Curated annotation (Swiss-Prot):
Belongs to the phosphoglycerate mutase family. GpmB subfamily. InterPro entries: His_Pase_superF_clade-1, His_PPase_superfam, PG/BPGM_mutase_AS, PGM_Phosphatase, Phosphoglycerate_mutase_GpmB. NCBIfam families: PRK03482.1. One of its GO terms (cellular component) is cytoplasm. This is Probable phosphoglycerate mutase GpmB. Substrate binds at residues 8-15, 21-22, 58, 60, 82-85, 151-152. It catalyses: (2R)-2-phosphoglycerate = (2R)-3-phosphoglycerate. Its EC number is 5.4.2.-. Gene3D superfamilies: Phosphoglycerate mutase-like.
Length: 215
């Protein structure tokens, strides 16, 4: 059985400012660095052999902290990037026009054909995230990889593993530095192939998440 750990990056300056990131980038806050150290401490005893990350700065920094705790190298994989948010990238949520907010809500509410102009669809995101996950099956026997990616991207991936449409990802709450795990197995009791072991675990964190504070 192959176990693959999934970690969302730590809190960023734009998370705190409610600015849309997508494939644009902003650095981790001091709290985001702290979150990364906490999740690194939690997984440091799990025998992680590979830390594979989106090539965006916020994920690479989170991955670096985890890799140092686990004694691994960091492997960059652009397929693990966040959903491209098109014309809404770098925009403050509170500054959106009614039309722009409608585009954003189509994504948040899980609309099958939701796509922000000049952006990426959930189906396209799901396809590249599944490709990245399937690549883990090519690692040497006994490997235990950890993937560092983004909230929408990981939610989309977990949704497809569950057999749900890619756009169902907004039904999953994956907070900054939450820990999830998917396993690939052959089992007489569960579906063969990929299964979800856990999703969105934050028991290692010691402060409320931004979405709790910003309600």
């Amino acid at each position: 059985m192959l176990q693959v750990y999934l970690v969302r990056h730590g809190e960023t300056e734009w998370n705190a400012a409610r600015r849309i990131q997508g494939q644009s980038d902003s650095p981790l806050t001091a709290n985001g660095e702290h979150q990364a150290r906490l999740v690194a401490q939690r997984v440091s005893k799990q025998g992680i052999t590979h830390v594979i990350t989106s090539d965006l700065g916020r994920t690479r920094r989170t991955a670096q902290i985890i890799a140092e705790a686990c004694g691994c190298e960091v492997i960059n994989d652009p397929r693990l990037r966040e959903l491209h948010m098109g014309v809404l990238e770098e925009r403050l949520i509170d500054s959106l026009t009614p039309q722009e907010e409608q585009w954003r809500k189509q994504m948040v509410d899980g609309t099958a054909d939701g796509r922000i102009p000049q952006g990426e669809s959930m189906s396209e995101l799901g396809d590249r995230m599944r490709e990245a996950l399937e690549s883990c099956l090519m690692l040497p026997e006994g490997s235990k990889p950890l993937i560092v990616s983004h909230g929408i991207a990981l939610g989309c991936l977990i949704s497809t593993v569950l057999g749900l449409p890619a756009y169902a990802e907004r039904r999953l709450r994956l907070r900054n530095c939450s820990l999830s795990r998917v396993d690939h197995q052959q089992s007489p009791w569960l579906a063969s192939g990929w299964i979800v072991e856990t999703a969105g675990d934050v028991t290692h964190l010691d402060t409320p998440a931004l979405d709790e504070l910003q309600r």
